[in-house]
Amino acid sequence: MKYLGTQTLETKRLILRKIKLNDYKDAFKNWCNSENVDKYVIWTKHPTEEETKILYTKWIEEYDEKTYRWIIELKDINEVIGTIDVSKRFLNFGTCEIGYCLSDKYWNQGIMTEATNEVIRFLFEECDADTICAQFLENNPASGKVMEKVGMKYEGRLRSRIFDKDNNRNDLLVYSILKEEYFNNKK
């Protein structure tokens, strides 16, 4: 795998780019403090803008050639509405595990599918990844629909794998797409 780091990517409606510190205000307003988003993520919503600012400062400092972390900016309004990133956990094996988060104001508009498609294209075509995978809590089937729309296939269920905010164990559902599947789907 070629390590190119977070490059600016563009789609019809979106700009995917590195996080800038001043993004924290939109992030806090649009998803980091959202009750609706909080239902479907494993982290706890941020009580203050300062918490989001601290996190973004840390993330900005972590950027290197093996960091793939994009802010999702909606072109029409020049506002950040979400994030999409790659865990470093399996990068040395050519496997990219992606995760994403989107403001609930933009759910069900195809935005996350558009962003994920572009990141998958970048990882396979420019970084030469072998496999791209993703996981989601079973209470978030919309995330699984995004994975299916971008060509990922259901791999299985990681039973009782993670605790939710109420300290209950939850299953994670796993999807992936292989390099050869991606290129075959493009034909």
Located regions from the model:
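A short helix-loop-beta-strand connector motif used in the catalytic cores of GNAT acetyltransferases and
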Residues: 57-71
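A short hydrophobic/aromatic micro-motif that marks alpha-helical segments and, especially, helix-coil
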Residues: 48-50, 63, 166
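Short, conserved alpha-helical segments within structured domains
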Residues: 44-48, 68, 139
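Acyl-donor (CoA/ACP) binding surface of acyl/acetyltransferases
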Residues: 1-26, 30-36, 73-187
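Conserved GNAT-fold acetyl-CoA-binding loop/helix
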Residues: 36-58
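Hydrophobic residues in alpha-helical segments
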Residues: 31-32, 41, 60-63
